[in-house]
């Protein structure tokens, strides 16, 4: 029963739609009706600007970090990564936003922040290097995931981490399939650092 409660709580944490809340409370708009319609940090940056984008991205990451920490905080014998994955599912298919959520990147990163801080920092490094070169947030997210898979397979012996990272990366690619088509067609929007404040 305790295990089920932890997993349900993790899903509900992940379901908190920070992009929707920030858009409605802070700006009076439903972000699902603007930009890509995605409830995530990237769309928030594009539609509402840097400040709102940072708040949403940090909030989405925090969901993953808190969810992964639940088994430890409550001394429940369940793997933190499993709770973290439940939060990612909640973020992507949130019960509080008609199951229309984000693309799993920030919340997945938050899970890694709790479980493997070194991997988190190296992921962030890869993300920003690719972002600096390509100016594509989507490509940066996917290649950071590829790096994570390679790193966990060849440089760790943590089987649960390998499985979780592989599944999350595959899921991130799935959620970015429209972005992949736009990158191939050269119609994917590139980042613009200046936005509405």
Curated annotation (Swiss-Prot):
Alphabetical list of PANTHER family matching this protein: GLYCEROL-3-PHOSPHATE ACYLTRANSFERASE-RELATED, INNER MEMBRANE PROTEIN YGIH
Protein's recorded name: Glycerol-3-phosphate acyltransferase
Primary role: Catalyzes the transfer of an acyl group from acyl-phosphate (acyl-PO(4)) to glycerol-3-phosphate (G3P) to form lysophosphatidic acid (LPA). This enzyme utilizes acyl-phosphate as fatty acyl donor, but not acyl-CoA or acyl-ACP.
Underlying gene: plsY
GO biological process: phospholipid biosynthetic process
Complex and partners: Probably interacts with PlsX.
Single GO MF annotation: acyl-phosphate glycerol-3-phosphate acyltransferase activity
GO annotations of cellular component type: plasma membrane
Originating species: Geobacillus sp. (strain WCH70)
Major site of localization recorded for this protein: membrane
Keyword Ribosomal protein among record annotations: no
Pathway assigned to this chain's UniProt record: Lipid metabolism; phospholipid metabolism
InterPro entries: G3P_acylTferase_PlsY
Record-stated family: Belongs to the PlsY family.
């Amino acid at each position: 029963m305790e295990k089920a409660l932890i997993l349900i709580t993790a899903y509900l944490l992940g379901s908190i739609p920070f992009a929707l809340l920030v858009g409605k409370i802070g700006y009076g708009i439903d972000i699902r009706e603007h930009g890509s319609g995605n409830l995530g940090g990237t769309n928030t940056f594009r539609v509402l600007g840097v400040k709102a984008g940072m708040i949403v991205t940090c909030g989405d990451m925090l969901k993953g970090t808190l969810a992964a920490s639940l088994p430890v905080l409550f001394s429940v014998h369940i793997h933190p990564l499993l709770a973290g994955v439940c939060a990612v599912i909640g973020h992507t298919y949130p019960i509080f936003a008609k199951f229309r959520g984000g693309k799993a990147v920030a919340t997945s990163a938050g899970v890694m922040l709790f479980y493997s801080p070194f991997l988190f920092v190296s992921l962030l490094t890869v993300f920003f290097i690719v972002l600096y070169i390509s100016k594509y947030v989507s490509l940066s997210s996917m290649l950071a995931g590829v790096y994570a898979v390679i790193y966990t397979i060849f440089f760790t012996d943590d089987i649960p981490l390998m499985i979780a990272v592989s599944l999350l990366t595959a899921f991130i690619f799935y959620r970015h399939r429209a972005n992949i088509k736009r990158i191939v067609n050269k119609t994917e929007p590139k980042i613009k650092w200046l936005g509405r404040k």
